[in-house]
Amino acid sequence: MNIFNYTTLIFRRLSSTFKASNKASIEWKKQNIAVKRKIGGYWNPKKKLPLESMDEIRRLKKEKSSMSCSELAKLYGVSPESIRRILKSSNRPLDDREKSRKEKRWLNSLKSNRDFA
Protein backbone atom coordinates (compact mmCIF):
# COMPACT_ATOMS: atom_id res chain seq x y z
CA MET A 1 0.00 0.00 0.00
CA ASN A 2 1.52 3.29 -0.99
CA ILE A 3 1.50 6.39 1.21
CA PHE A 4 -1.28 8.09 -0.78
CA ASN A 5 -3.76 5.24 -0.26
CA TYR A 6 -2.82 4.96 3.42
CA THR A 7 -3.35 8.71 3.96
CA THR A 8 -6.67 8.60 2.12
CA LEU A 9 -7.79 5.66 4.24
CA ILE A 10 -6.91 7.46 7.48
CA PHE A 11 -8.59 10.65 6.28
CA ARG A 12 -11.80 8.78 5.43
CA ARG A 13 -11.90 7.09 8.84
CA LEU A 14 -11.27 10.35 10.65
CA SER A 15 -13.83 12.25 8.60
CA SER A 16 -16.50 9.60 9.20
CA THR A 17 -15.79 9.73 12.95
CA PHE A 18 -15.87 13.52 12.87
CA LYS A 19 -19.14 13.52 10.92
CA ALA A 20 -20.78 11.20 13.45
CA SER A 21 -19.71 13.30 16.44
CA ASN A 22 -20.49 16.51 14.57
CA LYS A 23 -23.97 15.22 13.71
CA ALA A 24 -24.69 14.54 17.40
CA SER A 25 -23.40 18.00 18.24
CA ILE A 26 -25.64 19.56 15.59
CA GLU A 27 -28.68 17.68 16.93
CA TRP A 28 -27.95 18.94 20.44
CA LYS A 29 -27.59 22.52 19.16
CA LYS A 30 -30.86 22.23 17.23
CA GLN A 31 -32.67 21.07 20.37
CA ASN A 32 -31.09 23.85 22.41
CA ILE A 33 -32.14 26.51 19.88
CA ALA A 34 -35.67 25.08 19.71
CA VAL A 35 -35.99 25.20 23.51
CA LYS A 36 -34.72 28.78 23.62
CA ARG A 37 -37.14 29.79 20.89
CA LYS A 38 -40.01 28.03 22.66
CA ILE A 39 -39.41 29.52 26.10
CA GLY A 40 -38.68 33.02 24.84
CA GLY A 41 -35.01 33.53 25.59
CA TYR A 42 -34.62 32.81 29.29
CA TRP A 43 -35.89 30.08 31.57
CA ASN A 44 -38.90 30.97 33.71
CA PRO A 45 -41.10 27.92 34.33
CA LYS A 46 -44.78 28.43 35.15
CA LYS A 47 -44.73 25.86 37.94
CA LYS A 48 -41.82 26.01 40.36
CA LEU A 49 -41.08 23.06 42.60
CA PRO A 50 -39.93 23.39 46.22
CA LEU A 51 -36.43 22.28 47.17
CA GLU A 52 -37.75 19.14 48.85
CA SER A 53 -39.37 18.03 45.59
CA MET A 54 -36.18 18.73 43.67
CA ASP A 55 -34.20 16.64 46.13
CA GLU A 56 -36.79 13.88 45.81
CA ILE A 57 -36.51 13.98 42.00
CA ARG A 58 -32.72 13.64 42.22
CA ARG A 59 -33.08 10.77 44.70
CA LEU A 60 -35.63 9.00 42.48
CA LYS A 61 -33.37 9.35 39.46
CA LYS A 62 -30.44 7.87 41.40
CA GLU A 63 -32.51 4.95 42.68
CA LYS A 64 -34.36 4.24 39.44
CA SER A 65 -32.05 5.37 36.67
CA SER A 66 -34.35 3.74 34.12
CA MET A 67 -37.00 6.43 34.70
CA SER A 68 -36.97 9.01 31.92
CA CYS A 69 -37.39 12.76 32.31
CA SER A 70 -40.83 12.47 30.71
CA GLU A 71 -41.99 9.94 33.31
CA LEU A 72 -40.71 12.12 36.16
CA ALA A 73 -42.36 15.16 34.57
CA LYS A 74 -45.73 13.40 34.45
CA LEU A 75 -45.30 12.32 38.06
CA TYR A 76 -44.66 15.89 39.26
CA GLY A 77 -46.82 17.75 36.74
CA VAL A 78 -44.02 19.81 35.22
CA SER A 79 -42.32 19.86 31.83
CA PRO A 80 -39.55 17.39 30.92
CA GLU A 81 -37.28 20.40 30.39
CA SER A 82 -37.80 21.36 34.05
CA ILE A 83 -36.81 17.86 35.15
CA ARG A 84 -33.78 17.91 32.87
CA ARG A 85 -32.66 21.22 34.37
CA ILE A 86 -33.24 20.01 37.93
CA LEU A 87 -31.14 16.91 37.31
CA LYS A 88 -28.45 18.96 35.61
CA SER A 89 -28.26 21.46 38.46
CA SER A 90 -25.97 20.98 41.42
CA ASN A 91 -27.21 18.60 44.05
CA ARG A 92 -27.76 20.71 47.15
CA PRO A 93 -29.46 18.91 50.03
CA LEU A 94 -31.03 21.00 52.78
CA ASP A 95 -28.54 21.84 55.50
CA ASP A 96 -29.33 22.61 59.14
CA ARG A 97 -29.40 26.40 58.67
CA GLU A 98 -31.85 26.16 55.82
CA LYS A 99 -34.07 23.76 57.76
CA SER A 100 -34.13 26.09 60.78
CA ARG A 101 -34.96 29.06 58.51
CA LYS A 102 -37.87 27.14 57.02
CA GLU A 103 -39.15 26.23 60.48
CA LYS A 104 -38.93 29.87 61.60
CA ARG A 105 -40.82 31.01 58.50
CA TRP A 106 -43.47 28.39 59.10
CA LEU A 107 -43.86 29.41 62.76
CA ASN A 108 -44.06 33.09 61.79
CA SER A 109 -46.75 32.32 59.23
CA LEU A 110 -48.73 30.43 61.90
CA LYS A 111 -48.43 33.40 64.27
CA SER A 112 -49.55 35.88 61.63
CA ASN A 113 -52.50 33.68 60.64
CA ARG A 114 -53.53 33.41 64.30
CA ASP A 115 -53.49 37.23 64.61
CA PHE A 116 -55.99 37.57 61.76
CA ALA A 117 -58.32 34.84 63.02
Swiss-Prot record:
Q: Which gene encodes it?
A: rrg9
Highest taxon, organism lineage = Eukaryota
Chain residue ranges for the region called Disordered:
89-117
Name of a matching Pfam family = Neugrin
* Protein name as it appears in the record: Required for respiratory growth protein 9, mitochondrial
Question: Which GO CC terms are listed, alphabetically?
Answer: cytosol; mitochondrion; nucleus
What family does the Swiss-Prot or TrEMBL record give for this protein? Answer: Belongs to the RRG9 family.
Q: Which UniProt keywords apply?
A: Cytoplasm, Mitochondrion, Nucleus, Transit peptide
Its biological purpose? Required for respiratory activity and maintenance and expression of the mitochondrial genome.
A GO BP entry is: mitochondrial ribosome assembly
The stretch annotated as transit peptide is 1-46
Main location group: mitochondrion
Annotated localization: Mitochondrion; Cytoplasm; Nucleus
Query: Per the record's keyword annotation, is NAD included, yes or no?
Result: no
InterPro entries noted in UniProt:
NGRN/Rrg9
